[in-house]
Amino acid sequence: VRATEKFASMYFFCHSPQSAETDVAERGNKRPVWIMGHMVNAIAQIDEFVNLGANSIETDVSFDSSANPEYTYHGVPCDCGRTCTKWEHFNEFLKGLRKATTPGDSKYHEKLVLVVFDLKTGRLYDNQASDAGKKLAKSLLQNYWNNGNNGGRAYIVLSIPNLAHYKLIAGFKEALTSEGHPELMDKVGYDFSGNDDIGDVANAYKKAGVTGHVWQSDGITNCLLRGLDRVGKAVANRDSSNGYINKVYYWTVDKRQSTRDALDAGVDGIMTNYPDVIADVLNESAYKAKFRIASYDDNPWETYKN
């Protein structure tokens, strides 16, 4: 019996309806934030990053010359202060990730609710993008979603570095549909990660037929500094009545002051090598009043309206 069920009856004795309403109102007035553990490429790192405070992870996916997803691997160079060479076979990583996100499993982490796959498609020809999407979908269906039978529950973001590879999205959707599981697209979102002009990104989504589930990244390696100008443009698009963006995240943020700056700019997610740093800042009184760590009940495809 889960603790929440066990103590449900006690809750009604302890809480008046009014205080329950206050809890909901307080939750509704705080922006849900995703603390995104960066470069989680070995199964053992899933526990490590979630235990430090991450409710989301980012994993690199490399492809072979036939557009098969091959390894969870970044390689050199990578962020300052990190080992760049941890890896797993992609399908094995998916199995480990499934355990970490399947309720009832001994490795289950309730707080791990979102996974960003950083798709390293740079070595693929543009005309292989659709194939890469199909093969990626089949790998996820079999090894993560367990062919639709009580698989992992995390939401998935497909992060694509090249706007020219927009057909990856259609290929992914086509494969899930042909395999009989179009409903799993409800758990899938998108990101173009190349720091392109916001208007160009919008056009790529138009070509891809995407009208929702959009995360927009902005950032640079922690070895270099980058301002928040483009983040501001992405946030403005997100908050406009006709924008295409649902969520904005910034990477890679490892320091308290840059965390505060990103939160002040209105981001929904912060990618970091040090989840505990972000969690500490979110506990500061100024930020605790406005933000909270996202849970599974927070739909990552919905634009937050305060």
Curated annotation (Swiss-Prot):
Keyword Plastid appears in the UniProt entry: no
Disulfide bonds listed in the record: C78-C84, C80-C223
Major place of residence: secreted
Subcellular location: Secreted
Proregion residues excised on maturation: 2-27
Glycan-linked positions: N283
GO MF terms held by the record: lyase activity; metal ion binding; phosphoric diester hydrolase activity; toxin activity
Catalytic-site annotation from UniProt: H38, H74
Source organism superkingdom: Eukaryota
UniProt enzyme class: lyase
EC number assigned by the record: 4.6.1.-
Tissue: Expressed by the venom gland.
Signal peptide boundaries: 1
Pfam families on file: GDPD_2
Residues that bind Mg(2+): E58, D60, D118
Keywords (A to Z) from UniProt: Cytolysis, Dermonecrotic toxin, Disulfide bond, Glycoprotein, Hemolysis, Lipid degradation, Lipid metabolism, Lyase, Magnesium, Metal-binding, Secreted, Signal, Toxin, Zymogen
Keyword Lipid metabolism: yes
GO biological process: killing of cells of another organism; lipid catabolic process
Cofactor detail note: Binds 1 Mg(2+) ion per subunit.
Catalysed reaction, written as an equation: an N-(acyl)-sphingosylphosphocholine = an N-(acyl)-sphingosyl-1,3-cyclic phosphate + choline; an N-(acyl)-sphingosylphosphoethanolamine = an N-(acyl)-sphingosyl-1,3-cyclic phosphate + ethanolamine; a 1-acyl-sn-glycero-3-phosphocholine = a 1-acyl-sn-glycero-2,3-cyclic phosphate + choline; a 1-acyl-sn-glycero-3-phosphoethanolamine = a 1-acyl-sn-glycero-2,3-cyclic phosphate + ethanolamine
GO CC, any one term: extracellular region
Family the entry assigns: Belongs to the arthropod phospholipase D family. Class II subfamily.
Function, as annotated: Dermonecrotic toxins cleave the phosphodiester linkage between the phosphate and headgroup of certain phospholipids (sphingolipid and lysolipid substrates), forming an alcohol (often choline) and a cyclic phosphate. This toxin acts on sphingomyelin (SM). It may also act on ceramide phosphoethanolamine (CPE), lysophosphatidylcholine (LPC) and lysophosphatidylethanolamine (LPE), but not on lysophosphatidylserine (LPS), and lysophosphatidylglycerol (LPG). It acts by transphosphatidylation, releasing exclusively cyclic phosphate products as second products.
Name recorded for this polypeptide: Dermonecrotic toxin LarSicTox-alphaIB1ai
